[in-house]
């Protein structure tokens, strides 16, 4: 009873803190010069990480096994992974706007985990025989960490695409306006066109465009490195899962839905890393592959659980109302 109450308290404290954190991050994005809200949000995210760590330890003691046996526990661990990825760059780079994505991911996953939809699996249960192995920590933790890293990296790529295509849209819109002006041969219009050209050239080198260019470079830089880290975790998770499957079921690979989609996820991000080796495919082209990978991860992690079939069906659940 004590552990259950403590778990309930830690869950709501961490969710409340991360809700405040994402609000402060939005304020920081609206006003880039506001430093104090940013520092407060980072300290709040560290507090969230500590609360989630305490929550996982409490559930571990309460249940008697590592808390990765069902979808609820995996969502809490995913939130913990997001918060870990969030605070690591903070200790290296004190000011980093990219952490807004990880804060949003944390509040989304934790909000879903603590919602009424997963009420039926909030209480710890006895592990099924297939999960009573030392490989549980190795395999499942690596897979969840890989999902967290790959999702964060993919979201950075999505942001890169949005900013890039937005710039292209406004640039083409401006060019169409200039072409319309060229259809008139009046001296006054010609003068305005020349003035617009000078303005455009000046604007190109303005502080706003310089900041956008730097921000796009940061998005590309971090997405590549975070996805590379996630790909390593995914590879380790798949290999350890194959060894565990051989011990539990007598075969390294069975092509059940979860294994199939994990393999598809691995292929997609292997293609992404390959595109990074080609200079002509970097930037928006590789970001498109990562965006596809974002959808594939959610199918692999969450979508397959809705089916409730295959060797990994113990992680499935039924949607219920609160």
Curated annotation (Swiss-Prot):
Domain of life per record: Eukaryota
Function: Required during biogenesis of c-type cytochromes (cytochrome c6 and cytochrome f) at the step of heme attachment.
Protein name: Cytochrome c biogenesis protein CcsA
Xref: HAMAP family: CytC_CcsA
Entry's family note: Belongs to the CcmF/CycK/Ccl1/NrfE/CcsA family.
GO biological process, one term: cytochrome complex assembly
Keyword Plastid annotated: yes
Pfam families recorded: Cytochrom_C_asm
MF GO annotations: heme binding
Disulfide bridge map: none
Subcellular location: Plastid, Chloroplast thylakoid membrane
Complexes and interactors: May interact with Ccs1.
């Amino acid at each position: 009873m004590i552990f259950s109450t403590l778990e309930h308290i830690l869950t709501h404290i961490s969710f409340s803190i991360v809700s405040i954190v994402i609000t402060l991050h939005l304020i920081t994005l609206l006003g880039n010069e506001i430093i104090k809200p940013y520092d407060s949000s980072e300290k709040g995210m560290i507090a969230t990480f500590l609360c989630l760590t305490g929550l996982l330890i409490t559930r571990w003691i309460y249940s008697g096994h590592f808390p990765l046996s069902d979808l609820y526990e995996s969502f809490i661990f995913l939130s913990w992974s997001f918060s870990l990825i969030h605070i690591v760059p903070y200790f290296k780079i004190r000011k980093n706007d990219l952490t807004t994505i990880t804060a949003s991911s944390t509040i989304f996953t934790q909000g879903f985990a603590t919602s009424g939809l997963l009420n039926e699996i909030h209480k710890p249960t006895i592990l099924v025989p297939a999960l009573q192995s030392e490989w549980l920590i190795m395999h499942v933790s690596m897979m969840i960490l890989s999902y967290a890293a790959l999702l964060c990296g993919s979201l950075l790529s999505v942001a890169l695409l949005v900013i890039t295509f937005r710039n292209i849209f406004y640039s083409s819109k401006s060019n169409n306006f200039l072409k319309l002006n060229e259809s008139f041969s009046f001296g006054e219009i010609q003068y305005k066109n020349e003035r617009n050209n000078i303005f455009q050239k000046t604007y190109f080198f303005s502080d706003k465009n310089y900041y956008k260019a730097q921000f796009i470079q940061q998005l590309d830089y971090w997405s590549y490195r975070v996805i590379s880290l996630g790909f390593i975790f995914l590879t380790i998770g798949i290999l350890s899962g194959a060894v565990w499957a051989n011990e539990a079921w007598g075969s390294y690979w069975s092509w059940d839905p979860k294994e199939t989609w994990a393999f598809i996820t691995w292929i997609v991000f292997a293609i992404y890393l390959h595109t990074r080796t080609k200079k002509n495919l970097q930037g928006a082209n590789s970001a498109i592959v990562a965006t596809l990978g974002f959808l594939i991860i959610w199918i692999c992690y969450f979508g397959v659980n809705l089916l409730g079939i295959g060797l990994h069906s113990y992680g499935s659940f039924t949607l219920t109302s609160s």
